[in-house]
Amino acid sequence: MINNVSSLFPTVNRNITAVYKKSSFSVSPQKITLNPVKISSPFSPSSSSISATTLFRAPNAHSASFHRQSTAESSLHQQLPNVRQRLIQHLAEHGIXPARSMAEHIPPAPKWPAPPPPVQNEQSRPLPDVAQRLMQHLAEHGIQPARNMAEHIPPAPNWPAPTPPVQNEQSRPLPDVAQRLMQHLAEHGIQPARNMAEHIPPAPXWXAPTPPVQNEQSRPLPDVAQRLMQHLAEHGIZPARSMAEHIPPAPNWPAPPPPVQNEQSRPLPDVAQRLXQHLAEHGIQPARNMAEHIPPAPNWPAPXXPVXNEQSRPLXDVAXRLMQHLAEHGIQPARNMAEHIPPAPNWXAPTPPVQNEQSRPLPDVAQRLMQHLAEHGINTSKRS
């Protein structure tokens, strides 16, 4: 309703203009005054401005009164809907009265002739159960359809029965699932029109594959494959061909040359030694030494000692404890860690702040923070 009211406001000016254009009476030339009217409605978020034309004051007032009387009589024949009645009442409360009734914009319902009754014949089947229940439900609410719905349901075509399938020796019987399905349908009175066996093609008679060629390079199946074939044979499954033909023989590659040993070659680390020993216990011997893959450590020159000066401060307590912990485990750093800690800059002390009347004291949290720092020997020279 709100959308209808909001959309009607822009059309009020056009409706008033249409009243002027469609008027049938004639008047002498008169002066027309336009009065701007402000419209504000609780159904519209903002006010709208329209221009309303004042009524004509013509000498021939009989024609104008006759036109208004005929319009009032035509409005008696058709009652406006509830929404439009409320809209006219709402506009009348704001001093807006339309020049003619809005009922003339609602065309009357056309008087179409009733459709002819459908032709009933023997092929017309009755309505299904859902349609019967729907018509009964509508009849309970006083709704009666103008025509029968059975005419919209075309009759079932009289198609000829399909020809029976040709039975031959290759046709195999239905499987167990299909047999049970047909038996279940027969218990409910459903009989298929044709046999389902014709849709199952017979198994093709393919020739047996040729046996594989055995040669000296063919190695026996591994233990996993032997156990798999034995497990399948226990369940009555015999493969048509041997699986050994799918396993290519191992290539006879030449042994790699031994690596060149030099003075820079260091022995294998402890993890690699234990790995090689673990593989040797299981009969696995690597073809080459793994030491050749570990490059020797480069002989880099020792770094220059850092320049110590007066600004160099000693290591912090954490760094000193770290170096002591590493020294207990036999780890000595190659260079001093103090060179990575830049000295503290010698900045000038800041100027004291200017005290004035607007300077307010520190809040309670800042006072407690400064007191806590003073207890630990930290003195702040500048007020926060």
From Swiss-Prot:
<feature type="repeat" description="6">
    <location>
        <begin position="331"/>
        <end position="377"/>
    </location>
</feature>
<dbReference type="InterPro" id="IPR044889">
    <property type="entry name" value="TccP2/EspF(U)-like_sf"/>
</dbReference>
<dbReference type="GO" id="GO:0030430">
    <property type="term" value="C:host cell cytoplasm"/>
</dbReference>
<keyword id="KW-0843">Virulence</keyword>
<comment type="function">
    <text>Required for efficient pedestal formation in host epithelial cells during infection. Acts as an intermediate between Tir (via host BAIAP2) and host WASL/N-WASP. Directly binds and activates WASL/N-WASP, which stimulates actin polymerization and leads to the formation of actin pedestals at the sites of bacterial adhesion.</text>
</comment>
<feature type="repeat" description="4">
    <location>
        <begin position="237"/>
        <end position="283"/>
    </location>
</feature>
<keyword id="KW-0964">Secreted</keyword>
<feature type="repeat" description="5">
    <location>
        <begin position="284"/>
        <end position="330"/>
    </location>
</feature>
<feature type="region of interest" description="6 X 48 AA approximate tandem repeats">
    <location>
        <begin position="96"/>
        <end position="377"/>
    </location>
</feature>
<comment type="similarity">
    <text>Belongs to the EspF(U)/TccP family.</text>
</comment>
<dbReference type="Pfam" id="PF04806">
    <property type="entry name" value="EspF"/>
</dbReference>
<feature type="compositionally biased region" description="Pro residues">
    <location>
        <begin position="248"/>
        <end position="260"/>
    </location>
</feature>
<keyword id="KW-0677">Repeat</keyword>
<feature type="region of interest" description="Disordered">
    <location>
        <begin position="247"/>
        <end position="266"/>
    </location>
</feature>
<keyword id="KW-1035">Host cytoplasm</keyword>
<feature type="repeat" description="3">
    <location>
        <begin position="190"/>
        <end position="236"/>
    </location>
</feature>
<comment type="subunit">
    <text>Interacts with host BAIAP2 and host WASL/N-WASP. Can also interact with host proteins BAIAP2L1 and WAS/WASP.</text>
</comment>
<feature type="repeat" description="2">
    <location>
        <begin position="143"/>
        <end position="189"/>
    </location>
</feature>
<protein>
    <recommendedName>
        <fullName>Secreted effector protein EspF(U)</fullName>
    </recommendedName>
</protein>
<dbReference type="GO" id="GO:0005576">
    <property type="term" value="C:extracellular region"/>
</dbReference>
<dbReference type="InterPro" id="IPR006891">
    <property type="entry name" value="T3SS_EspF"/>
</dbReference>
<feature type="repeat" description="1">
    <location>
        <begin position="96"/>
        <end position="142"/>
    </location>
</feature>
